[in-house]
Swiss-Prot record:
CDD domains: IDI-2_FMN. This is Isopentenyl-diphosphate delta-isomerase. Homooctamer. Dimer of tetramers. Signal peptide: none annotated. It comes from Staphylococcus aureus (strain bovine RF122 / ET3-1). It comes from the Bacteria. Mg(2+) binds at residue 155. Substrate binds at residues 9-10, 95-97, 154. Keywords: Cytoplasm, Flavoprotein, FMN, Isomerase, Isoprene biosynthesis, Magnesium, Metal-binding, NADP. Its EC number is 5.3.3.2. GO terms for biological process: isoprenoid biosynthetic process. It catalyses: isopentenyl diphosphate = dimethylallyl diphosphate.
């Protein structure tokens, strides 16, 4: 594939993603908090700091991996980096393969660090990149963490995608052992299982982003790029973010879990934190805001989002993220069926 074709693919991904809409039905709507009428705290008591063994984020919300590798996506990364700088959010860039392959593309990613020199930035590579390239990806952005995206459904629907996956787990293990910053194993919208969590724990992984279905749909994106558009029947493949978080419960004391995939509102973010996530990521909401409404409007959107999270936590009488995990939740029969059939041991406070 030529550099021009790769740039074109990056732009196509963004165009199709922006045209997608949220899923009509979300598993976040299949779980409810139990309301208690009189909080014992005030809004100003709320501490939204997200603390993990290696990363401290001012807020448990981050701009998740999206793009880079073309002039248009450089402009997007520049604007998102300004939003991150002005709001204190962490930010992940999209796959840096283009920059690692062609130095001319490096600026489409490094613009994020240029615009946000003191901020927290996650670099991003695929599960098949050599260790040396993973190290380069971290150095390129002076990144505080490295996402490794695992995206086999996307690759298999992508006309020019990868068809070989046997080495992925061993390669991830090698990267984890060599890279000095936290390595986050990130799905891309298909969710995670307890079996995967077991395998990742065995190779020393300490961070995952479950990225469940319900948000940006890469099966749909790649199917749109197929000549016959003949794999649309896989559109609903995978676990939701709620199901994925429930799958991780037994591993949350050993692996820091981040949640993304289909988060629409501050309430969805709070529900994710209550299910054990340490932080929540969103992509398309930020992309649409910054492209359609500009930087200032997106900054205001983030500030409002954070304030709404504080209001919800006050209603729940939860001073911090840890308190949220002790709050009572009622699940729908469908979610309870998933828990039962998957033999998940879920204990609520």
């Amino acid at each position: 594939m030529s550099d021009f074709q790769r740039e074109q693919r990056k732009n196509e991904h963004v165009e199709i993603a922006m045209a997608q809409s949220d899923a009509m039905h979300s598993d976040f709507d299949k779980m409810r908090f139990v309301h208690h009428s009189i909080p014992s705290i005030n809004v100003n008591d709320i501490d939204l700091t997200s603390q993990t063994p290696d990363l401290t984020m001012a807020y448990p919300v981050y701009i998740n991996a999206m793009t880079g590798g073309s002039e248009w996506t450089k402009n997007i990364n520049e604007k998102l980096a300004v939003v991150a700088r002005e709001t204190g959010l962490a930010m992940a860039v999209g796959s840096t393969h283009a920059a690692l392959r062609n130095p001319r593309m490096a600026e489409t990613f490094t613009i994020a660090r240029k615009m946000n020199p003191e901020g927290m930035i996650f670099s991003n590579v695929g599960a098949d990149v050599p260790v040396e390239k993973a190290l380069e990806a971290v150095e390129l952005l002076e990144a505080q963490a490295l996402q490794i995206h695992v995206n086999s459904p996307q690759e298999l629907v992508m006309p020019e995608g990868n068809r070989e996956f046997v080495t992925w787990l061993d390669n991830i293990a090698s990267i984890v052992s060599r890279v000095s910053v936290p390595v986050i194993i990130k799905e891309v919208g298909f969710g995670m299982s307890k079996e995967l969590m077991h395998d990742l724990q065995q190779i020393g992984v300490k961070y995952v982003d479950v990225s469940g279905k319900g948000g940006t749909n890469f099966v749909d994106i790649e199917n749109e790029r197929r000549a016959n558009k003949d794999m649309d029947y896989l559109s609903s493949w995978g676990q939701s973010t709620v199901e994925s978080l429930l799958e991780t419960t037994a591993y949350q004391s050993k692996i820091s879990v981040f949640a993304s995939g289909g988060l629409r509102t501050p309430l969805d973010a709070i529900k994710s934190l209550a299910l054990g996530a340490k932080a929540t990521g969103m992509s398309r909401p930020f992309l649409n805001q910054v492209e359609n409404n500009g930087i200032a409007h997106t900054v205001a959107y983030v500030e409002s989002f954070i304030e709404h999270m504080k209001s919800i936590m006050t209603m729940l009488d939860a001073k911090n993220i840890d308190d949220l995990t002790q709050k009572q939740i009622v699940f729908s029969p469908e979610i309870l069926s998933w828990i039962e059939q998957r033999n998940l041991n879920i204990h609520r406070g």
